[in-house]
Swiss-Prot record:
Residues 1-22 form the signal peptide. Residues 90-99 have a biased composition (Polar residues). Induction: Expressed in the late phase of the viral replicative cycle. The gene is OPG135. Coiled coil: none annotated. This is Virion membrane protein OPG135. Residues 23-45 are intravirion. Envelope protein. Required for an early step in virion morphogenesis.
Length: 99
C-alpha cells in the first residue's frame, strides 16, 4: 500500500468519524429537548437519563467502528492471500516449464 493510499484512508476514516460525531450530537439535542419538556433540567433523573443515553450512543458508535474495521481487515487478509496464491502459481509455472 502506498503512502498516499494510507493517508487517504486515514482522512476518510476521520471524516466518517466526524459525521458519526455530528449524528450523535444531533440525537443528543433531540433527546435533550424531549427530556427538558418532560423532566426538570436540573433534576437528578434528568442527569442520569442523559448520561445513560450518551453512553448508549457512544457504545453503538464504538461497536459500529469496530465492526467496520474488522470487515476491512478480513477483506485485506483475503486479498493478500489470493495475491500470494497467484504469485506462487506463477512461480511454479515458470519453474516447471520444459527445457
Amino acid at each position: 500500500m502506498s503512502c498516499y493510499t494510507a493517508i487517504l484512508k486515514s482522512v476518510g476514516g476521520l471524516a466518517l468519524f466526524q459525521v458519526a460525531n455530528g449524528a450523535i450530537d444531533l440525537c443528543r439535542h433531540f433527546f435533550m429537548y424531549f427530556c427538558e419538556q418532560k423532566l426538570r433540567p436540573n433534576s437528578f433523573w434528568f442527569v442520569v437519563v442523559r448520561a445513560i443515553a450518551s453512553m448508549i450512543m457512544y457504545l453503538v458508535l464504538g461497536i459500529a467502528l469496530l465492526y467496520i474495521s474488522e470487515q476491512d481487515d478480513k477483506k485485506n487478509t483475503n486479498n493478500d492471500g489470493s495475491n500470494n496464491d497467484k504469485r506462487n502459481e506463477s512461480s511454479i509455472n515458470s519453474n516447471s516449464s520444459p527445457k
